[in-house]
């Protein structure tokens, strides 16, 4: 097999349990001057960045909502968790299928 052959892998994603963990990653990236893209999909607050070899990475925290995808809006990483979640709700509440996760009618949203 040709190990140098490009793959279709775009990035690796890592779910964290708390908003504070996203903030910890942000602070670490800031401390070592790594650029990142803070992107909100409505259902998650994410940080996208590259590792030293250029592989795409995402660290994300689930929001309490489900939103039809694709979505992507840059979010302010200086917000507190409460402010960020209020911003998410205001930003995405008029999008198709916006609902609390537990009320979502999409089967895969609440799978464990």
Describe the residue ranges of each PLM region:
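Zn2+-dependent peptidoglycan hydrolase active-site motif and core
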Residues: 2
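Vicinal oxygen chelate
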Residues: 5-7, 12-56, 61-67, 79-111
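Polybasic, low-complexity binding patches
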Residues: 71-77
């Amino acid at each position: 097999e040709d190990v140098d052959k490009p793959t279709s892998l775009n990035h690796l994603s890592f779910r964290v349990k708390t908003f504070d963990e996203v903030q910890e990653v942000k602070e670490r990236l800031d401390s070592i001057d790594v650029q990142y893209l803070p992107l909100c999909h409505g259902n998650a607050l994410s940080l996208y960045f590259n590792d030293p070899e250029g592989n795409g990475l995402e660290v994300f925290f689930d929001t309490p909502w489900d939103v039809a995808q694709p979505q992507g809006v840059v979010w302010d990483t200086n917000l507190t968790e409460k402010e960020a979640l209020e911003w998410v709700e205001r930003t995405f509440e008029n999008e198709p299928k916006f609902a609390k996760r537990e009320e979502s009618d999409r089967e895969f949203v609440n799978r464990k």
